[in-house]
Amino acid sequence: MKHYIDKNVYESATERFDYIYTHFDKVCVSFSNGKDSGVLLNLAIEAAKRHNRLPVNALYIDMEAQYKHAIDFTYRMFSRPEVTGWWVCLPIHLRNAVSQFQPHWLCWDQEK
């Protein structure tokens, strides 16, 4: 059975970020360039402003095969003065769900 509280998602997220900025000296938000992580980064910016902790550190691990609009969104977010972006491109072995012949692929493969 579900148990509801008298708070909405925004209020709960705000409380959590206030706790984070009160109890931790270093904060870094993981950013995937999706809409959920975009909301999370904006919530972190709001909290950092309240706690005088700007800019927000954000980490984006580039998987190489991304849509142009997703990359454009990352550029927009990381060009904001409230954000210090860490854009990382590493050769990482990943599962490949789109091929039966190549079950894994290596993003940022220097040999290709």
Region locations from a protein language model:
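ATP-dependent adenylation/nucleotidyltransferase module used to activate substrates
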Residues: M1-K112
